[in-house]
Swiss-Prot record:
Cofactor note: Binds 1 [4Fe-4S] cluster. The cluster is coordinated with 3 cysteines and an exchangeable S-adenosyl-L-methionine.
Name the UniProt record assigns to this protein: S-adenosylmethionine-dependent nucleotide dehydratase RSAD2
Subcellular location: Endoplasmic reticulum membrane
Record key words, sorted: 4Fe-4S, Antiviral defense, Endoplasmic reticulum, Immunity, Innate immunity, Iron, Iron-sulfur, Membrane, Metal-binding, S-adenosyl-L-methionine
Species this chain originates from: Siniperca chuatsi (Mandarin fish)
InterPro entries cross-referenced by the UniProt entry: Aldolase_TIM, Elp3/MiaA/NifB-like_rSAM, RSAD2, RSAD2/Viperin_antiviral, rSAM
Organs and tissues of expression: Constitutively expressed in spleen, head kidney and trunk kidney. Following viral infection, detected in most organs including liver, gill, intestine, heart, muscle and brain.
Gene name per UniProt: rsad2
Required cofactor(s): [4Fe-4S] cluster
NCBIfam families for this protein: viperin, viperin_w_prok
Length: 354
């Protein structure tokens, strides 16, 4: 018996389809059995390689910039030998652009802004700084606005105009011996840095601004006993830093400072801390605690990543936003909390006792 081509053709096609389906099903079953067998035997299935840097950026992407240090200028009138944020540019953002960036930070969760330099009172004789301080307190309603300064450019009229909007003023003072300050480079002509410190402390008391002192411990002041003068000045906080090297700033071929001769060991730093352990307001910061525990914005509003011992900038928050820029900051939030980075930082909540 013979089948006509017309009748035979659909049957052949059906057989082909069934055969193909059998092959596909066999392949699927084989693959499932392979992975299942591997899992049952405790073997590890192949996984794509993990981009650790990407994972780190995802973690940092979710970070809140609670406390930010904005170094809006690099220019300074002092020449401290260990300075780790030197005058490599003279750039300062226009006021409105700086305000725009600060607003972005507030919208991302910033509670505290610290203005630093360089010397922040140098630009426009402190007016630029004053306007930023006022904007952050009045317009942004930030709980804490603070400044770090060498104190040489501060006038009483600045307190009269902007003191109400400032929570904390930190003055850098590494020694209470004028000869030592000369060696370090924290000096301006014949002016007494220590006398000026006392004057500013009195203005802080008069205009109700919390007074803080920052000291960098180095080879020239590590043996000094500062107990009596610190007790007399009675700051709300005495931040004591171990001298830190940053490549490209105070170390390396492209640096404007050579800070190697100022560096002290961990043991010598600890000995200084032990001698001053009776001072309750002392807040120590070793190199380990300091290096990655600050969110630092440079003059272009770029976050600076210090993990590699240098300052690697992100893109500006003005261009890419806070969320993207902060993912390249290298910020160690755990170390920030460990070093006491979050404290009572609004003068409204402080019991200022003079």
């Amino acid at each position: 018996m013979q089948f006509s081509p017309v009748v035979a053709s659909p049957k052949l096609l059906l057989q082909l389809c069934i055969s193909t389906l059998h092959c596909i099903m066999a392949s699927i079953i084989s693959t499932v059995c392979y992975w299942t067998a591997g899992a049952c035997k405790g073997t590890t299935s192949p996984v794509p390689p993990v981009d650790s840097n990407l994972d780190q950026r995802k973690v940092q992407n979710a970070m809140t910039p609670t406390s930010v240090n904005y170094h809006f200028t690099r220019k300074c009138n002092y020449k401290c030998g260990f300075c780790f944020h030197t005058a490599k540019t003279s750039f300062v953002l226009p006021l409105e652009e700086a305000k725009r960036g600060l607003k972005l930070l507030k919208e991302s969760g910033m509670e505290k802004i610290n203005f630093s330099g360089g010397e922040p009172f140098l630009h426009e004789k402190g007016e630029f700084l004053g306007k930023l301080v006022q904007f952050c307190k009045l317009d942004l309603q930030l709980p804490s606005v603070s400044i770090v300064s060498n104190g040489s450019m501060i006038k009483e009229k600045w307190f009269q105009k902007y003191g109400d909007y400032l929570d904390i003023l930190a003055i850098s003072c590494d020694s209470f011996d004028e000869a030592t300050n000369q060696l370090i480079g924290r000096t301006q002509g014949r002016k007494s840095h220590v006398d000026n410190l006392h004057k500013i402390r009195n203005w802080c008391q008069q205009y109700k601004v919390a007074f803080k002192i920052n000291s960098v411990i180095n080879t020239f002041n590590m043996d000094e006993d500062m107990t009596e003068p610190i007790t007399q000045l009675n700051p709300v906080r005495w931040k004591v830093f171990q001298c830190l090297l940053i490549d490209g700033e105070n170390a390396g071929e492209e640096a404007l400072r050579e800070a190697e001769r100022f560096v002290i060991s961990d043991q010598l730093f600890q000995e200084f801390l032990d001698r001053h352990s009776s001072i309750s307001c002392l807040v120590p910061e070793s190199n380990e605690k300091m290096r990655n525990s600050y969110l630092i914005l440079d003059e272009y509003m770029r976050f600076l990543d210090c993990r590699a011992g240098r300052k690697d900038p992100s893109k500006s928050i003005l261009d890419v936003g806070v969320k993207d820029a902060i993912s390249f900051s290298g910020f160690d939030e755990k170390m920030f909390l460990k070093r006491g980075g979050k404290y009572v930082w609004s003068k409204a909540n402080m019991k200022l006792q003079w």
